[in-house]
């Protein structure tokens, strides 16, 4: 079966595993997914990531983070979809929950957070919001 939106699949797997409080979640690997996972680690939403090969399919294992019984990730939302791409200019970069969350943006310099995009003065495609 052909997957039309692998990034949405990754976010949904993380969201579902987080809701039922799984310690780890595994997703098929790609360069974009690795970049998103690295941002989640860098921003403190995920403990760490591990790359491995499950047969011929490279995978990413994300260790989810919890604060006691509370989830660190309270929400994940895919913004730009294959059927409706959402772009922002450097002056219109969105803030998630007035800066408490993170917008992940694909720019010409790679995949960065909203704060990094503002600092670099870059716009791009808004991939998702995490809070």
Swiss-Prot record:
The keyword ATP-binding does not apply. It holds the Pfam family Ribosomal_S8. InterPro entries: Ribosomal_uS8, Ribosomal_uS8_CS, Ribosomal_uS8_sf. The keyword GTP-binding does not apply. GO terms for biological process: translation. GO terms for molecular function: rRNA binding; structural constituent of ribosome. One of its GO terms (cellular component) is ribonucleoprotein complex. SUPFAM superfamilies: Ribosomal protein S8 (SSF56047). PROSITE patterns: RIBOSOMAL_S8. It comes from the Bacteria. Keywords: Ribonucleoprotein, Ribosomal protein, RNA-binding, rRNA-binding. Belongs to the universal ribosomal protein uS8 family. Part of the 30S ribosomal subunit. Contacts proteins S5 and S12. One of the primary rRNA binding proteins, it binds directly to 16S rRNA central domain where it helps coordinate assembly of the platform of the 30S subunit. This is Small ribosomal subunit protein uS8. It comes from Clostridium novyi (strain NT).
